[in-house]
Amino acid sequence: MHTIITAFSQRRPARLAACLAAVAALLLAPATGVQAATIVVDRVITGSYSIPDGSTVTFKAGGKFKNCRISGARVRVVPGGTRTIFDNCTFAGSFSNSELSATNFGAVPDMDSVPSTWTYRTGPSTVMRASVYRYRGTDNGAALASMGAFCSNGVNLTLHINGKFYTRINQQGSHNAIAIDNAEGVTIEGGTLLMGFKMWSCRRMTFKGISIVGETTAHDFPPIYYNADQYKAGSAWDKFWRAAGYTHDGEAWTNAATGERIDLKYLYNIKRGLSLVGLGNEAFLIGANPHYLPSTDITIDGCRVSMRTLGVMTAADPSAHNWRATRLSVTNCHFDHIYYQPIALHSGYNHIAHCTADYVFQPVDMSTYAHNTLVDDFKATRCGIGPKQENHSGSDESHDNELRNCSFAITDDIYLPDVMYEMLWVRQGRADDCFKLTNCKFSFTSTKKWFRGLMILTHKAIVSNCQFTINVKDPYVRAKDPAISGQAPDVNWIVNGYNAEPQRPDITLDNVRFVLGTTSRVQDVFFKIKNLKATAVTVEGNGTADNYFDHTRAIDVNKCRFDLPCQAIVAAGSNTASVTGTGNTFKVARGAKSLFPAGLKSQAFERDNTIGSQATAPARSKAKPTSSKPGRSRVPQRAVTSSKWHF
């Protein structure tokens, strides 16, 4: 060092002197706030307070920050208990390696419930009153928002929701959520909240054992429904609301005298009017700020979500691809009374496992940008509609998703008129996409809904070891047009590829069972499929089928049992190019005339499969023929049979 200084002093003596003077000043100066330190707070601190980067803050009795703006980076906080240490505070910078509780931010765990009568006004003739318990308590919105701000930009934090914390529902439709931005390695656990979470650009986040509820205890509610007709002058809806003193501004009904605003938008658009249905909005909303990275590795485990519009939602903006999330894990959670979807995904590499749901409109939505998602052991009852995979029009980025070991029961408990109801809706996908349905059970029981079957519109689907039970008694098509009652089918189709050529799907069915309960007539069992390969498939029940295959380009079925008496195996006019397979049994309705369309080469197929009712021919009468008129006799008719066909 002496050599270096000597050489430097010989070349730049003035500069060396200045540097040495500056170093001496720093060494001799007293400690300042820019140095990392252990800070003990033993009094009430207000105003703005800057904590040296990397410092540790501890608290003594009576010590806290109040109405304070606190700044600092990588600050560690040791609260020394659960009392309030941040009272109405805001934060700038970041905190790390700290463990706190909700009450440290001034939240008061006094939420309880009182009996209440909840009134739903969802239309001119729909009024429902439910006896419920309404939550009440201290409004902890500001305190919990402060907790979220503390977590933002933080690293390795643990937050305990140590109690039940009430928050007033924001009736103007804001997210009403604890907002956390750009945090990493944060764990939040326990307790009950009326406020959900909104995470932007967060990484390695864990939520454990949290209950997120709505304004009231869980109870069945009528889905809010509207269409454009209700806003037309003179409509029943228009007369109803105007007679009650409301006017419509294009978005909601407003009472000028009271200021009450009632928005009847349903499903995607329910933003305002949450108080009308007693719901909170998303329990967990996960996305990305365009200026930061996507949210990744979010774990939600052992949580319960009730009376919300949505449960867990990963958000994506189609116009900004970096607004995506990835690697979401939702396990051991329960969802009930969810207005729309417990699971709504716009993200990739998701794992949903061991979850249950009840009274939900649609249990699982793998929507735009949802790909490589596994939903395993998800059991849902009282669903309005079945799960789906879907994309924005023109996009191919929802692909390679799977439902495994799941069960979905679709009933009339949640019903909206004029809506198409699918057991499963799978749409879009890439050219190499394969949607998988494995070891699942579906049931559809309705006297109201327009059953649309399994709508599979992706490029390829594999369905294995699954069962589908269909009980449709009073079909939508008859209810809409009484003039055709008794003529229209209960079910238009069971499996439908839907698309026009050449976008129709390739579908593989292996060990799949379709059971018709109260359903009496199916028009087409398999409809508009490019290539259908079926092995060990059973179609059985109480009904009949007009056709088993219609507009299915190539059919290869083996060891299947088609037990519904049909009028045709392949519909007349179908564009089927080939039908192959062996070891199948087809039951055929008496009086059926043409089982295959003209021109389809089906001789080998007819030879290698058993086609007919499997009923034995009636025994011949031993009695002598009798005649009703002289010279004419009545002879018992003999059934037309062959070695393979039995009518």
Regions found by a protein language model. Name each.
Residues 37-70, 135-186, 190-198, 519-520:
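N-terminal extracellular ligand-recognition/capping segment immediately after the signal peptide
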Residues 248, 253-255, 261:
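Short linear proline/tyrosine/threonine-rich motifs used for host-factor recruitment
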Residues 153-157, 179-187, 199-209, 214, ...:
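Surface-exposed loop/turn motifs in large extracellular/passenger domains
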Residues 52, 61-98, 102-111:
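Sequence/structural signature of small/polar-enriched beta-strand/turn repeats
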Residues 36-37, 93-142:
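Right-handed parallel beta-helix/beta-solenoid
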Residues 1-13:
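N-terminal secretory signal peptides that target proteins for export/translocation
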Residues 17-29:
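Bacterial N-terminal signal peptides
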Residues 62, 67-70, 74, 155-157, ...:
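Short glycine/acidic-rich loop motifs that flank beta-strands on beta-rich extracellular proteins
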